[in-house]
Amino acid sequence: MIARLILIVFAINFSVLADDDKISLSLLNAELKKNYAFVERSLNKSQMKIDNSSGKIFFDETGITINVLTPFKENYRIEGGMIEIHDLFLDQKQLINVDQANNFFLNILIKGIDENNPSYRVNIVNNDIIEIMSTEQNALVSFLFYKNRLELIRYTDSIGVEHGIELRPL
């Protein structure tokens, strides 16, 4: 009787622990609101060139701040439907409406993921990748996890440049 009870308790605990290891949209949305240091690598296939940039991304109650530290110092502030771009080297600022940017990845970053949104499909692959496929723009964004931590984001932009963004929590 005691052995059976121990076996049942073990099975319940194991199933709870196994569920903790599964990635989900709620985990992705939580990970997308953390502050990170990042290294972004982009491959322009037409020029066969890889560019690198690095910086930090911060989330707060009203928006997102992205500080690019290399190769050029730029700050981006996304708030209230607008993107402010500040080129620190040239000391120039520009405002862009988020809707005019028409960027699938940016919209995911701002709004998060809702599995019932008809403008994209969600696919979980091998319990370590969440793919978001736009039904309107034929765009795919992949979020790669390691031990339930968002480690890498991959996407191809509208001009065919492939991007990989490695993340490290701050």
Predicted segments, located by residue:
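A short, Trp-centered hydrophobic/proline-enriched beta-strand micro-motif
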Residues: 28-48
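A mature extracytoplasmic/lumenal domain signature
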Residues: 40-42, 70-72, 80-82, 89, ...
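An acidic-aromatic
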Residues: 56-104
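Sec-dependent N-terminal signal peptides
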Residues: 4-13
